[in-house]
Curated annotation (Swiss-Prot):
Upper classification of the organism: Bacteria, Pseudomonadati, Pseudomonadota, Gammaproteobacteria, Enterobacterales
GO process annotations (BP): response to toxic substance; toxin catabolic process
NCBIfam families: PRK11536.1
Entries under InterPro entries matching the protein: Benzoxazolinone_Detox_Enz, MoCF_Sase_C, Pyrv_Knase-like_insert_dom_sf, YiiM-like_3-alpha_domain
Highest taxon of the lineage: Bacteria
Database matches in Gene3D superfamilies: PK beta-barrel domain-like
Gene Ontology MF terms in the entry: molybdenum ion binding; oxidoreductase activity; oxidoreductase activity, acting on other nitrogenous compounds as donors; protein homodimerization activity; pyridoxal phosphate binding
Name of this protein: Protein YiiM
Any one of the GO CC terms: cytosol
Quaternary structure annotation from Swiss-Prot or TrEMBL: Monomer.
């Protein structure tokens, strides 16, 4: 199955309280180089929590925009791609039918699903909606991130094509394990066994198993 894709990149900008972000992106056409760190011309702020080899690309399903426009009718005009800061936008791929570790061919490159996107408080400023990061997490409409396992030239003219599936954990299930379920060591083990899981999510699940408790999400979701 092949999925046509729209492609977006962005530059770092200042947001309220002086926090930088590259969430504002623009559509790009033509050929780009995709490296292990992401798309040519795309920037990430605060690289401790954004970007890097495990989180080189962000994918957000176009299907979700109608949901958000209905939830916030007064701001409906905001909810068009790439409003959530995604690099890739498609129809037909969602958290329910994409699996952890899925490998897609994109042009000359190969990319692998590494984790659900962990929404952060900068989205609240970006949309001027105080709790949209929390709402994304609650609904599971978060999208997902990729690592780049084979760099190469890519473009919006090259569709995504699934070439390998080795996991039984969907992105939707991974998000539920991480954020919605009570402490469950067996589910953490299941998630840790999923191919390609990012280092940051691996550390988080390992810490939970060692500590016996779930970490606080408030700093990521609210910035405090």
């Amino acid at each position: 199955m092949r999925y046509p894709v729209d492609v977006y990149t962005g530059k770092i900008q200042a947001y309220p309280e002086g926090k930088p972000s590259a969430i504002a992106k623009i559509q790009v056409d033509g050929e780009l180089m995709l490296t292990e760190l992401g798309l040519e011309g795309d920037e990430q702020a605060e690289k401790k929590v954004h970007g890097g080899p495990d989180r080189a690309l962000c994918h957000y399903p176009r299907e979700h925009y109608l949901y958000w426009a209905r939830e916030f009718p007064e701001q409906a005009e905001l909810f068009v791609a790439p409003a959530f800061g995604e690099n890739l936008s498609t129809d037909g791929l969602t958290e329910s039918n994409v699996y952890m570790g899925d490998i897609f061919r994109w042009g000359e490159a190969l990319i692998q699903v590494s984790q659900p996107r962990s929404p952060c408080y900068k989205l609240n400023y970006h949309f001027d909606i105080s709790d949209i990061a929390q709402l994304m997490q609650n609904t599971g409409k978060v999208g997902w991130l990729y690592s780049v396992i084979a760099p190469g030239k890519v473009s919006a003219d090259a569709p995504l094509e699934l070439v390998s599936r080795v996991s039984d954990v969907t992105v939707q299930e991974a998000a539920a394990i991480a954020w919605h379920m009570p402490f469950d060591d067996d589910q953490y083990h299941r998630l840790l066994s999923a191919a390609g899981l990012s280092k940051s999510w691996t550390r988080t699940m390992q810490k939970r198993r060692l500590s016996g408790k779930i970490e606080d999400f408030s700093r990521r979701l609210w910035g405090k």
